[in-house]
Amino acid sequence: MAGERRDSKAAAFFCLAWALCLALPGFPQHVGGREDRADWTQEKYSHRPTILNATSILQVTSQTNVNRMWQNDLHPILIERYPGSPGSYAVRQHIKHRLQGLQAGWLVEEDTFQSHTPYGYRTFSNIISTLNPLAKRHLVVACHYDSKYFLPQLDGKVFVGATDSAVPCAMMLELARSLDRQLSFLKQSSLPPKADLSLKLIFFDGEEAFVRWSPSDSLYGSRSLAQKMASTPHPPGARNTNQIQGIDLFVLLDLIGARNPVFPVYFLNTARWFGRLEAIEQSLHDLGLLNNYSSERQYFRSNIRRYPVEDDHIPFLRRGVPILHLIPSPFPRVWHTMEDNEENLDKPTIDNISKILQVFVLEYLNLG
């Protein structure tokens, strides 16, 4: 997760300004020198979820298994994986293999590019997994899979970034696996509105700074992909709309896995979607589906607001994409230390947040 400048008030104000000016519905956006936009690009602002009832929630949560996720997805990712390292390649192959093996039929693409870093030119590779590339609109769930680069330690320890962001990666893979049946149905649906709304999972490379957080040494993968999507016509063959405009909502996961996280509201224009997370959390609690949980330690807190922090959403925010940033405040105490490892993860918390996210995704995609 992003670096040393994230607590800067100036950076926070800059991000907030973008949030208020660019991300608000109806703010003019220029595509090919024109301001006119197809009606479908406005549908995100009036989109309504299908609220799951208790029976559906019980069914969804019964499909997920945190122990299986831990063994099959988290352990393979809990290795040193800074850009260009052998671990980075291994994790990338694991993510692609897991998604390609699902029945839903994901289109899994590797977006590889080179960028200048403090250590010279490095190769980066984002992973983009799209359920239905022909759908006009996509809910995006994203995280970064790289780990921060540290010089070799005298004690031989390496930084594995458990919360930052191995756990979010594993949660996204578990979401795709446990919801495979429902997502297969969505993929096969040929009737609107389901045919025009789908899911995209993005795993960014190069989120972390190599040396010191700066506009040029950070967010390598998200900066590159946002620029690429802004210049790629969407739907295919379109002349006035692009892939950026096809993003309904950009949900970014980061620093998840420590006990008792508090997620505040960072962007007011997506507060209604944050409210759904809060409501889902309460519903799961009422149904007795959250483990080692106390309502006094609520995760999603709409009564708490914080200035935005710099992360992979920034290049998309600057292009007018609505952002739902799921990052705790304060950060976990192990942030950017060698202690951000498996030993300091809290399995019940991860299981609980994973369930909440899965219900949220189904509701957003109207798969109730």
Curated annotation (Swiss-Prot):
Subcellular location: Secreted
Top-rank taxon: Eukaryota
Record EC number: 2.3.2.5
Tissue: Expressed by the venom gland.
Catalyses which reaction(s): N-terminal L-glutaminyl-[peptide] = N-terminal 5-oxo-L-prolyl-[peptide] + NH4(+)
Residues annotated as binding Zn(2+): D164, E208, H336
Positions bearing carbohydrate: N53, N292, N352
Top-level class of the enzyme under EC nomenclature: transferase
Cysteine pairings via disulfide bonds: C143-C169
PANTHER family: GLUTAMINYL-PEPTIDE CYCLOTRANSFERASE
Protein's name in the database: Glutaminyl-peptide cyclotransferase
Species per Swiss-Prot/TrEMBL record: Boiga dendrophila
Biological classification of the source: Eukaryota, Metazoa, Chordata, Craniata, Vertebrata
